[in-house]
Amino acid sequence: MIETPAAAVISDKLAPKVDFFSVGTNDLIQYTLACDRQNSQVERFCDNHHEAVLRLIEYAAGNAHSHGKWIGICGELAADTTLTERFLRMEIDEFSVSPSFILRLREKVRSLNLSE
């Protein structure tokens, strides 16, 4: 699991030792941005679209693929269809979402033209 910034940063070293990566986006956001969605004093710092988080995911994806491994994402970001195209361009291989989000995610994927 890539759930901490440290794991993402050393994903080039982890990739040869694992079968795949799964990015736990809820924890990755909290640990990267020093925020807590369940603490009203710091929840405002949680930004699901923060560039630092997205770059860590992209970096881990590149390292996974350079070692012939697949990478999936889970957590709230996996179901966020405003990020689906970006994740597909990162070559994220799998989206792990709750059943209630499957149809919406499938429709989003089908609507995209990634060859543009």
Locations of the language-model features?
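Conserved alpha/beta-domain cores
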Residues: 1-116
